[in-house]
Amino acid sequence: ATIYLADSARKSIVVGVNAGHGISGGASVKTQCHPDGSPKTTGGSTAQGATYATAVSGGMTFNDGTAESTVTLQMAQILKDKLLAQGYDVLMVRTGDDVQLDNVARTVLCNNVADCHISLHWDGDGLGYDKGCFYISVPDGLKSMEPVASHWQEHDALGASLVEGLRTEGMTIYQNGSMNIDLTQTSYSTI
C-alpha cells in the first residue's frame, strides 16, 4: 500500500482506494466472514450462511480475456489522480498486479489510515452488455452487528453519493443504484 499526498489545496482527508482482487493465491485462503464469527446474511461470491470466505477471490474475466484485477487497478489509478487533483490524499491499497493483503487486511489498513474506503469491482454475471453501476448497500441482517451498526448509514450515504455522481455524468445505473450484499469488508469497517 502507498499513500499519496495532494500537491495543493489539501483537504486533510484520506481516501482509501482499493483496486479489487489482485492477490496471488488469495482464492486458496479463507478468512472469517464477520468479526464475531456469525454466518453471512446474504449470498454473493460467498454463500449465505457461510462463516468463512475466500480471502481475495480471483474476480471475473471480461469477454476479451482481461482480468477484473487489471481493470480495477486502472480504474483506481484514474480515481487516485482525480482525487489528488481535488486536494484529497489517497491511500492506494494496491499499486501493482499483486498485493498480499486479503479483504480483512485491506479493510483494517483503511480503518487505520483513511477517512473512507472505496473498493472498486466489476460484476461478472456473464451479460454481454454493461448493466450499470451500483454500490453494495448494507443488508438489514448486518445493521445491528458492530462495527457495522456504528457506520452503516455513512457507508450507504457514501455509496449513494458516488452513484448519484456517476448518474450525473451520464453513466448507466443498475436498477436503483444499490444492491444489498453481506461483504466481509463491510463487516470489518470502522470508517
Placement of each model-derived feature along the sequence:
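Catalytic-site microenvironment of enzymes
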Residues: 1-191
